[in-house]
A protein has these predicted regions:
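Nucleotide-state-sensitive switch-loop elements of NTP-binding domains
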Residues: 63, 79, 85-94, 99-236
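Short catalytic-loop micro-motif centered on adjacent basic/acidic residues
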Residues: 162-163, 247-250
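Conserved lysine of the Walker
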Residues: 76
Length: 309
């Protein structure tokens, strides 16, 4: 049995005063009372432009990649799974990929998802990128190119460079690029980690260049060098191509997830990537808001929906 219950508020938890008030309720066991409408009556939900989802998500001759980003807990996993199922039901062969070690797509789909693509239902497959396995595979691929061409001292230096903290993330990035390049799937949906981690992955093409150069310098064949360099350029081009890659932000209408999503959008823009869809999750329908608790919470949400617009 829980020793204390933390009740969902009718408003966001923000500021010292609000935290102090909630702490008193939490540790005294006093339940919150919603006797009045504390907030100004909400205006109508702002009219939000609805994009043509099929045009946005369905492929047009090339593999399409869909990335869902956002603060932890906003519903990325559920929305990624729903999106993948929606596309698969259209007869499109779809792969759902998670790069977040804490993701629960297997629990949402009610199936076991491992490090190899598993068939979930008609046209839908799912896979979880095991970062440790991806790291070992990535590291070995680079070192195998260098063995027999460099001294043991040089190989040791390269291995030390590959053991840097960001290489594991680079390996995960390289793995999901492989899925995009894989012609077996028409659409690849990525249930990504919380925003900061995802943006770190999206910064990798620029750090990745250094390790591409390692592979290039280790290769004697001019053809191998050109292939590695062209692949790197293609990765950047694919991420920036709105027809091939769609970045979506998932949030709920409160201050913190909105600000985090806004910063992510600006960071993407700086990298030459446009956010094409914003999903506002957990919005209360007006018809269920029949008491002060729900009315207050909806008033807050409508205010933030206006900001999102």
């Amino acid at each position: 049995q829980p020793k204390r219950c933390m009740y969902l508020r009718d408003n966001e938890v923000k500021g010292v005063s609000a935290l102090q008030h909630i702490a008193r309720e939490l540790y005294t066991g006093k339940k919150p009372v919603y006797e009045i409408e504390r907030m100004q009556p909400a205006r109508l939900v702002p009219k939000i432009e609805r994009p043509d989802i099929d045009a946005l998500f369905l492929p047009a001759g090339q593999t399409k990649a869909l990335f869902f980003m956002g603060k932890g807990g906003v519903g990325k996993t559920s929305i990624s799974c729903m999106t993948a199922l929606y596309i698969a039901q259209k007869g499109v062969k779809t792969l759902l990929v998670t790069t977040d070690p804490a993701a629960h797509i297997g629990e949402v789909l009610d199936v076991k998802v491992g490090s190899m693509p598993e068939n979930i239902t008609d046209n839908l497959f799912a896979v979880m990128v095991n970062q440790q396995e991806a790291f070992q595979e990535y590291k070995e691929r680079i070192l195998s190119e260098a063995r027999g061409r460099y001294s043991e001292d040089m190989l040791a230096t390269m291995e030390e460079e590959l053991n840097s903290p960001c290489t594991e993330e680079m390996a995960a990035f390289d793995k999901f690029i492989q899925y995009i390049e894989d012609k077996d799937y028409e659409v690849v949906v990525f249930d990504t980690a919380p925003t900061g981690h995802t943006l770190r992955l999206l910064d990798l093409p620029f750090d990745y260049a250094k390790q591409v150069e390692m592979m290039v310098s280790a290769a004697e064949s001019r053809e191998i060098k050109e292939t590695a360099q062209n692949r790197f350029r293609d990765i950047i081009s694919t991420l920036r191509d709105k027809k091939r890659t769609v970045f979506s932000l998932v949030l709920y209408p409160e201050s913190t997830p909105i600000m985090e999503s806004y910063r992510a959008m600006l960071d993407l823009k700086e990298a030459g990537i446009e956010t094409q869809l914003v999903v506002a999750n957990m919005v209360l329908p007006e018809e269920v808001c029949t008491n002060n608790y729900f009315k207050n919470r909806r008033h807050m949400q409508v205010k933030y929906l206006e900001q999102i617009k």
